[in-house]
């Protein structure tokens, strides 16, 4: 069973006055007028309506999953190469830092930098952590959880007592 700790739709626009892109992870892509004042989006076009909900991959929001066997962080870093990224584990935290120097793109020159810090669950095996970058720019940081035999499934026998219970009956 996957349990999403930080669900992407939770931070989506909940109304017309919520700046949906303001807190998203668009590293250096810039904000537009309708991002800061979405009710004025008619200045761009009276027929344009920005979607209030986007997919997690489009928005760049990180996602943290923790299930019974595994801990996973998914992070959209499509504007960074593996050489631009640094992933460190410090005590009970994983720090992901990305930075690339100024480079030219279609609209001029741009530089990007971000820093993310996540707390690792105590049950994660820190000696078996791994990190990979997919071709479409998704960084996946994962690690297995330690198996604690004392917390496994066990059967508790039910004994029968001869005396009645002292608890009041309903």
Swiss-Prot record:
Its main location: cytoplasm. Transmembrane segments: none annotated. Belongs to the small heat shock protein (HSP20) family. Acetylation at Lys-99 may increase chaperone activity. This is Alpha-crystallin A chain. The lineage of its organism: Eukaryota, Metazoa, Chordata, Craniata, Vertebrata. Zn(2+) 2 binds at residue 107. The modification N-acetylmethionine is found at residue 1. Contributes to the transparency and refractive index of the lens. Acts as a chaperone, preventing aggregation of various proteins under a wide range of stress conditions. Required for the correct formation of lens intermediate filaments as part of a complex composed of BFSP1, BFSP2 and CRYAA. It comes from the Eukaryota. Zn(2+) 3 binds at residue 151. One of its GO terms (cellular component) is nucleus. The modification Phosphoserine is found at residue 45. The modification Deamidated glutamine is found at residues 6, 50. Zn(2+) 1 binds at residues 100, 102. Residues 52-161 form the sHSP domain. It is found in: Cytoplasm; Nucleus. The modification N6-acetyllysine is found at residue 99. The modification Deamidated asparagine is found at residue 101. Residues 144-170 are annotated as: Disordered.
